[in-house]
Amino acid sequence: MLSLALPCRSWAHRLPAALKFGLLAVAMIALMRIGSLAGQGAAVLVVAALTASLGRKAIRQSLVTLRPLVWIVAVILIWDSLQGAVAQGVLFGLRVLAMVGLANAVTLTTPLPEIVALIERLAQPLARFGISPRIPAISVALVIRFVPVLRARHDTLAEAWRARSARKPRGKLLAPLTFSLLDDADHMADALRARGGLALPRKGRDTVGT
């Protein structure tokens, strides 16, 4: 399974995954409690500086991640402006940019196996109720991994459509995209079954899938 983490090593890569996600949770709570434009603006600058300290590749990847979000924030800002709540819209936009930027920085500096291992450790109490801790761990890993895969697959299909037609595809890419993802899901299910599935690990065996 591929990871979204940057291949280069930075100071943030050396931090334990538990520490990074713990600090991320605290930062998210703090951002929700900041109610001033100056405070949220300062938070965005701090997140930008943090991302810049990770290197040029981190900056480029963060910009790619935030690009679709800018349009969503712009639409919300326009709506709030029409409602006479410009300050509220700006505050919301800054908060979202800071949160997503910070979460993206953690994702870029934490290899996927470390994320899976962390979630599996946190989910160990579920084993008392007969629920395998691997289920939430693998579920989160699949979501993180397949979101960019879905976007890349859509871009590939759209490029193939443009090579054959000058018309916009509109919803005509939905069927081939769905079938290709279902095929990937079948292969993923076979791979999971070959590695023991998601059942509770037996005693004496390693509980962290790699």
Curated annotation (Swiss-Prot):
InterPro entries: ABC/ECF_trnsptr_transmembrane. Changing residue 195 to E: Approximately 3X reduction in BioMNY ATPase activity. Loss of BioMNY complex assembly. It is found in: Cell inner membrane. Pfam families: CbiQ (PF02361). It is a multi-pass membrane protein. The chain crosses the membrane at residues 11-31, 34-54, 72-92, 99-119. Keywords: Cell inner membrane, Cell membrane, Membrane, Transmembrane, Transmembrane helix, Transport. Residues 32-33, 93-98 are extracellular. It comes from the Bacteria. One of its GO terms (cellular component) is plasma membrane. Residues 1-10, 55-71, 120-210 are cytoplasmic. The keyword Cell inner membrane applies. Part of a biotin transporter holocomplex composed of BioM, BioN and BioY. BioMN complexes can be readily purified, but not BioNY complexes. Only the BioMNY complex has ATPase activity. Probably involved in biotin uptake, although complementation experiments in E.coli do not indicate a clear role. Belongs to the CbiQ family. This is Energy-coupling factor transporter transmembrane protein BioN. It comes from Rhodobacter capsulatus (strain ATCC BAA-309 / NBRC 16581 / SB1003).
